Amino acid sequence: MAAIPASGSLVATHDYYRRRIGSTSSSSSCGSSEYSGEVIPHHPGLPKQDSGHWWSSFFFGKQNLPGMGTVAEEAQQKSGVVSVTNGQVTCVAREMVMRQASESSDGGKSEAGNS
């Protein structure tokens, strides 16, 4: 049975993964601190975005499915909220808008009834 030298392949493997994770050295061939570690090539079928989240364009892309966002739009119109970031409303924001709308329609009675 062959023995694996402790200072041989394990150190080389450690160095390999350390370089892939992104540690930079002064002898880097690119010469820029902007590119550290392995550069992942951009797929030509995916649009380039500043956020770096390719999956966000996949899920929340340009396609407009029928019936999408109508609940959020109605909630915004009722509560008077106008600003929407990138046309997206998260579940948390939607809950907050609905809660504010219900509290304003109650006139604060729910808070007074609890005390």
From Swiss-Prot:
Biased segments, Low complexity type: 22-37
Keywords for the protein's UniProt record, in alphabetical order: Developmental protein, Differentiation
Superkingdom classification of source: Eukaryota
Positions of region (Disordered): 21-48
Any Pfam family hit: PPDFL
Disulfide pairings: none
GO biological process: cell differentiation
Keyword Glycoprotein: no
Keyword Transferase listed: no
PANTHER family attached to this UniProt entry: PANCREATIC PROGENITOR CELL DIFFERENTIATION AND PROLIFERATION FACTOR (PTHR14572)
Role this protein plays: Probable regulator of exocrine pancreas development.
UniProt family annotation: Belongs to the PPDPF family.
Protein name per UniProt: Pancreatic progenitor cell differentiation and proliferation factor B
Organism whose genome encodes this protein: Danio rerio (Zebrafish)
